[in-house]
């Protein structure tokens, strides 16, 4: 295991070397680092051939160092290529890490960290109020008023704990995508099914006609890794590109961890590629600037509101928050059938992901959707937090 303090001293000795890559330390004191696991990001302009040559070289160096020192490091684990933003994740010893940092083609390296869902489960039955709230300027209505196109022709990627794609709320519109978390292609937690139901469920969802793709990046305990999240995002962009739906797609990330430049860069590339990205602000009642992917400027960062148009007590806040959406006591689907109630910025984010798909289905450009949602939003949130918007999601129904 590499101690970050020792590593900082170790790296400082090479600070004068212009070619040396930057080792980024995450900026959140509560970040849970994964020992000896690193995310390596290549410089812009590195060709596919040079990237492959670098991968081959690192694999060879790792094998040599492992044989020489008898370490138990696993080496290269996965590669990323999100619209020519290239990198990889690996389990490396200190000497291999030194060689990576000395390669002039490497932009930066950061240590992998644990990422968790941003939702809190509640086991009581409560009526869903979010749909009515986002389609009316005033609080109190239980009617959801919406254009009947409802996201038709748009695909939403649920990057989460998996999705029960056979749940009756999806009516055949959901399919399995990929799994970067484990070997169990099922939602054993329930979080991912709930968020998917919120963004595109027939009964509980915003974009009732959108297609749904399950991208499992978190396990049954609701946790995963930054590298696994990036691998999931990588899949979404490549899948959308292969299917010709860039410009007709959205992505929901109801998850987060400490600040990660690599995580932020990955979601930014996805957004710039033509996928509208909604992310949860986080549930620690703290400034969301210290969290990723919430702190990525290009995405739509969502805080949570209550039925009374107040900031949810748990919701993160701050200048990176783009909009509020219903997140307390939200009812939606659960794996195996039926429904359950959950609270969190995890529940707020899919309201915005679904609304993004709704807008895209009516002709909006994914790159402009967040700005459009902020223009439409209602100035309704009381005590939103220091330097935080008070704008609440609204679909422009005229009600």
From Swiss-Prot:
Induction: Expression is strongly increased during growth on protein-rich medium. Expression levels are the same whether keratin is present or not in the protein-rich medium. The keyword Signal applies. The keyword Cell cycle does not apply. Glycans are attached at residues 102, 252, 308, 395. Residues 1-19 form the signal peptide. GO terms for biological process: proteolysis. Secreted subtilisin-like serine protease with keratinolytic activity that contributes to pathogenicity. This is Subtilisin-like protease 4. The lineage of its organism: Eukaryota, Fungi, Dikarya, Ascomycota, Pezizomycotina.
